């Protein structure tokens, strides 16, 4: 018999299965428990050499982050409760009367914050994870696109020009000028890519020194005496 939920995305099925098996409240999901179940399930699937999609692995990371955030919030609540206990234990009436009213209001605010913590339903949890997944995928896609563009430019440049000619040309300019400010000398993206690898070659050969005081800051190519 085929499971009617088989067509549901694997990570969604795993979360729903975890809620059912651990007898969790679907209207107020315990993030820490579902994260632990999910990680354990992944370990079990890997034992059987089952190939897992990138989404399944990414969701594990998202759940772990959500678990750490939930535990941090719980610690903050417990810390506030400890302070409340100390305030109740010590009687400050003998010291000063006025702060008592402020302290009472502060306690009411803390109680209000604790009560205002909204429970997370299983549907809300799944929607939140889907949003996080889309963010990660979009970010990766943009990085891959930029990387591919640079690789294509480098390939085109290598096909068009012999890299040794570019190195010789750069060295000739460097011998005339002594110091080259990379971003000022090479204005276009194509030129910056074209001369970057030759700059590394010259530095590796001990003919030039590359200086960059700040990350992504001004790059200076300085001629070395040889």
Curated annotation (Swiss-Prot):
Keywords: Coiled coil. Residues 121-163 form a coiled coil. Pfam families: SMC_ScpA (PF02616). InterPro entries: ScpA, ScpA-like_C. PANTHER family: SEGREGATION AND CONDENSATION PROTEIN A (PTHR33969:SF2). This is Uncharacterized protein MJ1134.
